[in-house]
UniProtKB/Swiss-Prot annotation:
Native source organism of the sequence: Calycanthus floridus var. glaucus
Localization: Plastid, Chloroplast thylakoid membrane
The protein, known as: NAD(P)H-quinone oxidoreductase subunit 6, chloroplastic
EC numbers: 7.1.1.-
Annotated GO MF terms: NADH dehydrogenase (ubiquinone) activity; quinone binding
Topology within the bilayer: Multi-pass membrane protein
Gene encoding the protein: ndhG
Length: 176
């Protein structure tokens, strides 16, 4: 998507804010239904991050798979939970929670300082020009198809066999 610079930046800021607010909603909301819907917002924002970089197929695939299937499955599973059994032994704050939040906060601040102090100019311009021309000649779907049929053929087939085994196992468990 060829957007002007300020519009592109504003779009990324709004997607980032939606991602942060949705992530906070997943963690902080006590109702599991609201938390699952916040996870849906996070997954939508992640899939929409691919649109400004002209990866429409990846955005559509993530939107269909994660939001359309995984999040609906999570909401469906949360609906079957019995909420009363989880809220009986609820402690507001434990020592493990404090240690975990301290570790996560220190990792967050170290990542922020690393990103802030990194010179991104040299990283952006290291791509060779012939790679850019080769990528522009084919669409995203063609690039994915070429990569799956050549470089990633064996891993693709192994993943399909693993998924088939998981499906057969799920059917066998459902029959019992």
């Amino acid at each position: 998507m060829d957007l002007p610079g300020p519009i592109h930046d504003i779009l990324l800021v709004f997607l980032g804010l939606g991602l942060i607010l949705g992530g906070l909603g997943v963690v902080l909301l006590t109702n599991p239904i609201y938390s699952a819907f916040s996870l849906g917002l996070v997954l939508v924002c992640i899939s929409l991050f691919h649109i400004p970089s002209n990866s429409y197929f990846v955005a559509a695939a993530q939107l269909l798979i994660y939001v359309g299937a995984v999040n609906v499955l999570i909401v469906f599973a949360v609906m079957f939970m019995n909420g009363s059994e989880y809220s009986n032994d609820f402690h507001l704050w434990t020592v493990g929670d404090g240690v975990t939040s301290l570790v996560c906060t220190s990792i967050l601040f170290s990542l922020i300082t690393t990103i802030w102090n990194t010179s991104w100019y040299g990283i952006i311009w290291t791509t060779r020009s012939n790679q850019i021309i080769e990528q522009d000649l084919t669409s995203n779907v063609q690039q994915i198809g070429i990569r799956l049929a050549t470089d990633f053929y064996l891993p693709f087939e192994l993943i399909s066999i693993i998924l088939l085994a998981a499906l057969i196992g799920a059917i066998a468990m459902a029959r019992q």
